[in-house]
């Protein structure tokens, strides 16, 4: 049988760089009559360089429409296009359902074109994820205003790396623009030129030298920088490179930009460069979405990489993979063995290379683990037993108890009735107790003020705990506390675009939280279940490294057989679960399971009952599936998915952890700390209420005393004087006349 080679090296003339060289050579030939007489090889090289620069400039300007001009739909490589090339036949006159038949040549030609298109996507992906485009994205526009955040620029290797990346951006992208306007901002703004300048060799050199002198300065006053750059009406592109969260709220910045750009065609491009905190990424992404611009996040240390161009290209490549699966199904019904082998060979190559090799990876993603030995972490519930308000004797009722008195009522024989004790309102306030009763509290303001200070210190400790829970591997997994641990990894086909994220999350866990455990195992599941080892093995440096190398070879396929993975873990790895303590299963998944939630809940409730075994769910949200992609086997909204897994964790007495690209959405560990903070704030408010009530009573007493003192004088002054009748007098001489 003759075997065709359909490798990804076919049709190399579609390489953008080779196309560019070929086009340039053709242009040289065509332009040789336009006064460009080449007499030396150096002149040819200069001319090629000039032509290449002009072509690259055009490519940068038209890149927004690149995918539209090379999409599967535009290239007529969709399933509908394939069906339109087939012939409809009725095999049985009694059967009204027609069947579509394809010739070998039709499928052969369609598959060849699809393979070429995927190769082109590969080349485009490499181009988008190299050099300055990886760090800052693809800068659009010809007259660019560049804002550089200098608030977090610090000395050391980080500064040098940032300056080198900026220099690369200047050489590769900004050098192809027409005009530039550059300023830095921190507490104040500093501009290189008072007005936009024409791009030339001298201005670019001046800019590169200026970048080397960047110094840290205060906070991140983005609004002040925007006011200056948006006043330059000649600019058609605004690029902001930030390394920290802006001082102003995103809603305020969005309103200001929209009002300032009303009636203008201005492209907004916001970059977060190595922002270690997830909060700036969330704020700036929402800001860019509201403005209809492009957001680019580059933070390899935190495993954050977001690019709209890359995401759209990956989605189109994913559709091509789905189409190949459909072609494979066609070949099973095709009698041509040669064609079936050809399709199988191409699909195998695609499954191996185009996706995981093109996905952006953190630095040293495939390097050996750097294993740390941490302390044995506790869940927040256990941690609060030692550091909570009650454990620290900072409960409000604990503090007030020595000065709290029950109301006293006794029968007075001489009065022949029951009389209640009088409250001394100058020092006591009636206060509702935690059991609903009312007690008389002796209020001592200095004691309560000191108590509020202690509450403030406790809240600071809780806030540090919250921040600690949101960093490194705990952001993805929470705290892994048990001594015997099994990790379940969701590698269903819907997670194909996120396999690097899944692997990186596992890497952080292996490095930071598993080295102090006793036994562990890793189970990957899609439609089928595959485990790293048949059963749990002892934790060692070598075993952790071997587990990581195994995880690097994982491929996403099939649906989401959660029940199968749970059964493998519980019935094989934890078959002796009643003989051991401190055992945990950590399910790392991105969507709703294949099985009904009630079935899962009933199974884990029975399996985890009567032993020290917990199921903890780590749910990562990857967004809603695209309407034009292959639908998942089971679908539920993000809220329904979260509710389903919360029900499962509650049945297994475990913890629920839900996160996404913008941070942690919900976590039982974090919720426990937040609840303790809210309790401390509530206690502080009640202290303030007690002091205010005491002051209010004292103020009323003083006012009453003053009124009583002034009352007689006021009444005396207000009474009208009594008028007496005039005394009788004798008639005057005038009246007698």
Swiss-Prot record:
InterPro entries: VWF_A, vWFA_dom_sf
Chain intervals with Basic and acidic residues compositional bias: 1-17
UniProt domain VWFA: residue ranges: 484-681
Record-linked Pfam families: VWA_3
Domain of life: Eukaryota
Region (Disordered): 1-22, 711-737
Protein name: von Willebrand factor A domain-containing protein 3A
Source organism of the structure: Rattus norvegicus
Source species taxonomy: Eukaryota, Metazoa, Chordata, Craniata, Vertebrata
Originating gene: Vwa3a
